[in-house]
Amino acid sequence: VEAILQMVSPSDEHQVDPQKVGAKLLLRPGTIVLAADDSFVARSLIEQELKVLQAPYEMTKSGKEAWDRLNALAAAAEAEGKTVLDKVALVLTDLEMPEMDGFTLTRNIKQSARFSGLPVVIHSSLSGSANEDHVRSVGADGYVAKFVAEDLAQTLRQVLP
């Protein structure tokens, strides 16, 4: 998919229009968006959009990398007498990734008391009712199709407290 996207869609077509995504994303001070996607194209688009939304973020390349980073952020928060919600505003994850997929990442987050209340948005090129049902079954707070910046911005705003 990655190679096809790069062939059929020049990189300048993947520019995020600030007018379409809207105003700054309001995150709690000191928090970030933790994002996971193995696709270079998708990571680039997510980074562009989060920059336009003025949202601090950390980007990872797999569910496992995101899970490890999330646990490290939680440990750092706990060492300061805080919770992970003082460090991470939400997790944005792809579904199909090496090492750990987005379903497993989401399930791990939602089943852990340590991450209670942490919103998870699944951002995927996979569609269809079976995937959307599975997204709900693992407890994701939102689902949005890839490559539509304004839909992602709207979904992030909807799930943020």
Where are these predicted regions, by residue range?
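Non-catalytic signal-transmission and effector/linker regions of two-component phosphorelay proteins
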Residues: 1-32, 47, 71-87, 149-161
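Short hydrophobic/Thr-rich beta-strand motif most characteristic of the beta2 strand and flanking loop
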Residues: 54-61, 69-70
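Receiver (REC) domain active-site loop signature in two-component systems and cognate sites
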Residues: 97
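Charged docking surfaces used in two-component/phosphorelay signaling
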Residues: 44-52, 64
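Acidic catalytic/metal-coordinating carboxylates
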Residues: 62-65, 86, 101-105
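Alpha4 helix (beta4-alpha4-beta5 surface) of REC/receiver domains from two-component response regulators
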Residues: 104, 126-146, 150, 154-157
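Short amphipathic alpha-helix used as the core "switch/output" element in two-component signaling
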Residues: 68, 103-116
